[in-house]
UniProtKB/Swiss-Prot annotation:
Residue ranges of the region described as Disordered: 169-227
Chief localisation class: membrane
InterPro entries reported for this sequence: Cupredoxin, Ephrin, Ephrin-B_Ecto, Ephrin_CS, Ephrin_RBD
Record PTM Phosphoserine, positions in chain: S280, S286
UniProtKB keywords: Cell membrane, Developmental protein, Differentiation, Disulfide bond, Glycoprotein, Membrane, Neurogenesis, Nucleus, Phosphoprotein, Signal, Transmembrane, Transmembrane helix
GO biological process: axon guidance; embryonic pattern specification; ephrin receptor signaling pathway; nervous system development; neural crest cell migration; positive regulation of T cell proliferation; presynapse assembly; regulation of autophagosome assembly
Protein's organism: Rattus norvegicus (Rat)
Similarity comment: Belongs to the ephrin family.
Compartments reported by the entry: Cell membrane; Membrane raft
Residue ranges crossing the lipid bilayer per the database entry: 237-257
Region spans: Interaction with ZHX2: 262-293
UniProt name for this protein: Ephrin-B1
Gene that encodes it: Efnb1
C-alpha cells in the first residue's frame, strides 16, 4: 500500500506532465527580422516593397534609425492602410497612424504583435489569410512629414505587405489572385503593384486559365492543397482551446478529489477514536477477578449507591453516560469506623 506522501508526489508529477504537454501544444512564436524604415534599406524592392509572412503570435519591430553624421535625418509618418490606399499611395481618408519618425537624436522602435484578439482597446488585431499594408506618404523631409499623397510610397515603393498565416512556398501570388476572387481589394493591389515588365494582358489570362485547370485537376492540385492547409490551421485554434480547457478541468478534478479524500480520512479517524473510547470504558467497568464474581460479564454496569440523604456516594465517580447507562469507577477507600452508630442494649 502506497504511503500518503507517495500518492501526493505521483499526483503532482501527473499534473506537471499535463501542464508541460499543454505548453508544448501551443505554437512557438518568434521575433521576425526588424525592418529599418530608411530609404537606404535594400529590402524595399522596386514595384513590390517588402513582403513578409508572419504567423499569429510573431512580433515585428519597425525601427526609425537615428541621424547619422554626414546624412540628413529622414522624417516619416507610418500608416496602416487598406489595400486600395496602398495601391494609390494615399492616406487622405481614415488614416491609421502607427509611429512617427521625428526624433533624430534617438532610435525609435515600434513593435507589432500579430494577434487575433488584443487585450487593449486600441490594439492591432490580425486575421489569418489576410493581407495588411504599412506605408508612408511622407517624402523624408520635415516639411513633407504630413504629406497624404505620394511620398516615398510612390517614389521608392517603401511599403510592407504582411501576409498573415500564409505560406510563401504553398502558392504563388498569381494563384492567390485567382483562388480568392472574393477579395477584390487584394486583387486590385496585386495588379497595381506589378512590375512594368510583367507582360501583356493575354499572358496574364493564360496564367489564370492554367491555375484554374490545376484547381479542377483533383486532390493533388495546388488549390486543393491550399484548402486543406486552411482547414488545418483553422482547426488548430479550436484544438488549442480544447486542450487548455481540458487541463483546467483536470486540475479542478484533482483538487476536488483531494479535498474529498481528506474529509473521508478525517471522518474515519473520528469514528475510530470513538470506538476505542467506548472499549476502554467497558473494560474499566468490569469487576476484579478475586471478588468472587468471576462469571460476571464485562458489560455489567455498577449501579451507583445512594445515601440516606439522597445524595450520590462520594466514593463513586461518573465516567461517561454518552453511550448508554452511566458508568462509575469505584474508588478503593480504607475502612473507616462509623461515626454515628447506636447499639440497642
Amino acid at each position: 500500500m502506497a504511503r500518503p506522501g507517495q500518492r501526493w508526489l505521483s499526483k503532482w508529477l501527473v499534473a506537471m506532465v499535463v501542464l508541460t504537454l499543454c505548453r508544448l501544444a501551443t505554437p512557438l512564436a518568434k521575433n521576425l527580422e526588424p525592418v529599418s524604415w530608411s530609404s537606404l534599406n535594400p529590402k524595399f524592392l522596386s514595384g513590390k516593397g517588402l513582403v513578409i509572412y508572419p504567423k499569429i503570435g510573431d512580433k515585428l519591430d519597425i525601427i526609425c534609425p537615428r541621424a547619422e553624421a554626414g546624412r540628413p535625418y529622414e522624417y516619416y509618418k507610418l500608416y496602416l492602410v487598406r489595400p486600395e490606399q496602398a495601391a494609390a499611395c494615399s492616406t487622405v481618408l481614415d488614416p491609421n497612424v502607427l509611429v512617427t519618425c521625428n526624433k533624430p537624436q534617438q532610435e525609435i522602435r515600434f513593435t507589432i504583435k500579430f494577434q487575433e484578439f488584443s487585450p487593449n482597446y486600441m490594439g492591432l488585431e490580425f486575421k489569418k489569410y489576410h493581407d495588411y499594408y504599412i506605408t508612408s506618404t511622407s517624402n523624408g523631409s520635415l516639411e513633407g512629414l504630413e504629406n497624404r499623397e505620394g511620398g516615398v510610397c510612390r517614389t521608392r515603393t517603401m511599403k510592407i505587405v504582411m501576409k498573415v498565416g500564409q505560406d510563401p512556398n504553398a502558392v504563388t501570388p498569381e494563384q492567390l489572385t485567382t483562388s480568392r476572387p472574393s477579395k477584390e481589394s487584394d486583387n486590385t493591389v496585386k495588379t497595381a503593384t506589378q512590375a512594368p515588365g510583367r507582360g501583356s494582358q493575354g499572358d496574364s489570362d493564360g496564367k489564370h486559365e492554367t491555375v484554374n485547370q490545376q484547381e479542377k485537376s483533383g486532390p493533388g492540385a495546388g488549390g486543393s492543397g491550399s484548402g486543406d492547409t486552411d482547414s488545418f490551421f483553422n482547426s488548430k485554434v479550436a484544438l488549442f482551446a480544447a486542450v487548455g480547457a481540458g487541463c483546467v478541468i483536470f486540475l479542478l478534478i484533482i483538487i476536488f478529489l483531494t479535498v474529498l479524500l481528506l474529509k473521508l480520512r478525517k471522518r474515519h479517524r473520528k469514528h475510530t477514536q470513538q470506538r476505542a473510547a467506548a472499549l476502554s470504558l467497558s473494560t474499566l467497568a468490569s469487576p476484579k477477578g478475586d471478588s468472587g464474581t468471576a462469571g460476571t460479564e464485562p458489560s455489567d454496569i455498577i449501579i451507583p449507591l445512594r445515601t440516606t440523604e439522597n445524595n450520590y456516594c462520594p466514593h463513586y465517580e461518573k465516567v461517561s453516560g454518552d453511550y448508554g447507562h452511566p458508568v462509575y469507577i469505584v474508588q478503593e477507600m480504607p475502612p473507616q469506623s462509623p461515626a454515628n452508630i447506636y447499639y440497642k442494649v
